[in-house]
Amino acid sequence: MLFVGNSLTATNDLPATVAALARGAGRRPVEYATVAPGGVNLEDHWNLTGARDALLAGPWDVVVLQQGPSSLPESQENLRTWATTWADLARAHGIRPALLTVWPETERSYAFPAVVQSYRAASVAARATLLPAGPAWLAAWRRSPKLRLYGPDGFHPSVLGTTLAALVVYTRLTGTPPSAIPLPYRAPTARILRRAAADALR
């Protein structure tokens, strides 16, 4: 599994968290690589070539693509264009493309619906599997509004937020129900995360 993103992927090491969930569930190990420098989008990754080189070096079953919230009109267009470009390259090499929906900064929480719609539209345009981490956060807050999914800066995820994103990634890509994945939290919190992931994946 190749992850191509930025600090939203790198913070708390989302790929390693996905692999840890697989281990905890006694499932097939997840082998992964990550190209996720801070502050870059998918267009930057294309021009910098390191992520392309990693993709072509494979073999990978899946490439997980991620950029910033992409809620503004020009950012939505950029996401659609470059998600499609990356997805086409992935499919040409027998790799399944997936797109990870993220979240806005806390001070722009009003943009959450636009972020969700932006990633949904981009996944359709790119014919990529949608990994709805952002919607899972919303589903978790509906059950527990004070759940701390953001880290201290109000944008990057807390460890809990990364765990929920990883649960969405792993269960969507493997078809494993969230209820089957052990989580390193007390039962009430683990239950909220599993149900939130299930809600987002419906």
Show the residue positions of the predicted features.
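Ser/Thr-glycine-rich phosphate-binding loops at phosphate-binding pockets of nucleotides
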Residues: 6-7, 158
